[in-house]
Amino acid sequence: MKKRISLYVRSVLTFLRIVITKIFNIKGFHSAFIQDFSITTKISVNERGKILLKKHIHTKRNVILCAEGGTLEIGEGCFFNNGCMAVAKERITIGNRAAFGPNVLIYDHDHDISSAESIHDSGYKTSPVVIGDDVWIGCKYRYTSRNGNRA
């Protein structure tokens, strides 16, 4: 009975969080209302970023989903374990039913260290990341990567 009550409370809080996030990010945030987010999940849309979430996405504690000028698209039925982070400056596309182990970091960018400037002024190199359907990733995911279906 306690689990059922906890699930209902979490569902209501997730729904409210999605509504509030949508209000403050009208153009940059699109989500199905059927999600299961931990109370500590952070969603951030900066600059011209966009986050597109399909339904039935489940997150554990301390997950961060961030679009910093890029597009973060997450397919149906995805699972993010504790401490996962996805940050898009260009584009990250995650297929349906993808699962991520604890502390997986997904970035589509890296510091541009080829520049003669200091690391703080050098900017970023970006490349799209595509993760297919039915994929399980258990550790850090490097930018410029492409992972096909059922990997």
Which residue ranges define each predicted feature?
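Extracellular/periplasm-exposed beta-strand and loop segments of Gram-negative cell-envelope proteins
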Residues: 110-111
